[in-house]
Amino acid sequence: MVKITINGQCIETQENNTILQAAASAGIRIPTLCYLKDINEIGACRVCAVEVEGYAKLVTACNNRVQEGMVIHTNSPKAMEARRTNVKLILSQHDSNCAVCIRSGNCSLQRLANDLGILEVPFEKEIPENNWDRKFPLQRNAAKCIKCMRCIQVCDKIQDLHIWDVAGTGSRTTVDVSGNRVISEADCSLCGQCVTHCPVGALHERDDIGQVVHALADENKITVVQIAPSVRAAWGEGLGISQEKATVKRLVAGLRRMGFDYIFDTDFSADLTIMEEGSEFVQRLSEEKESKLPMFTSCCPGWVRFLKSQYPDMVDQLSSAKSPQQMFGAIAKSYYAELLGVDPASIFCVSIMPCLAKKQECAYPVSYTHLTLPTILRV
């Protein structure tokens, strides 16, 4: 243990702690932007810069360890001025049109600028152009990127796919798809971790709400929606609604008021997936040497993309059963269309799910014409 002083408060902390960790343990908040515990501790944003007595320069709190007798000032005039300047420099290369940003109200940079009282940016704006495939489920806006490197570190250290990398030099340094590739040709599994850890609106999922609204307004369309179990269980959290009020009945009632004709739970098609995969597994076991084992589930499109790109020699071990989302779509466009006596093309299926990869999965070309039900349920 070492003894240090932060903002006049004497603190005893672990010897290997960073200044940021020591301050947090004492209830002292030091603002950060790029910091991600154990993943991204590079001090790139310089927002966590603090003043240490005896040091000629400010030091970043996220990656500098405490030392015995340190006297630290987190909000000294020198530290605050540097913090404001660093944020202003970041804003000079950031599209600050917050009113139409997907992260408005939930943006780390926006909150930090407000906390620091930044009302104007004295530096000349240098906003990079945004060239991105608008059809791809994962969307990136280069004009919003603050070069925090979180996406790179998360993809490298957690997913180990190395999709992102640093591109350019000097003031033109940015983040882009590694290997000078376009995102659709990269090995991205669409896990969504880079989106989750992006502190601003630079990374986000493709917005398909417009298509849904258009379908709901079309009198010739029969709208069918399926709700994933995880969404059913947690939909109220994002809206600040208690578990007692965020019931399934209220969720269904809300979808009804929006105009959906038929509402289903993905539990149904998940059961179909289990039955199909179980039957296939028994069949593979009976074939002995003719089948490759173990058999892997195919219910997760992110996992399927990962296996195909990283372990192509194991593709034959994937189950041929569709995922629950695909099975529901197949049933809706075949059996259910026949039950309703309507043209399958008039049915518009909507999936409310927490998975980015499912946006790509639902775009796969599939034909259900003249197929038997067992065939429809298989890939």
Predicted regions and their residues:
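N-terminal cofactor/phosphate-binding cores enriched in small/glycine residues
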Residues: 11-68
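Conserved small/polar residues in nucleotide/adenosyl-binding loops
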Residues: 369-375
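Eukaryote-biased recognition of intrinsically disordered, low-complexity regulatory segments
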Residues: 1-7
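Fe-S ferredoxin-like electron-transfer domains
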Residues: 46-190, 196, 203-218, 222
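Glycine-rich beta-alpha junction loops
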Residues: 66, 105, 158, 229-231, ...
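Cofactor-cradling patches in redox/metallo enzymes
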Residues: 51, 80-81, 234-244, 251, ...
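Flanking helices and flexible, charged tails adjoining ferredoxin-like Fe-S electron-transfer domains
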Residues: 176-289, 318-322
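Extended hydrophobic secondary-structure segments that form protein cores and membrane-embedded regions
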Residues: 226, 295-297, 348-354
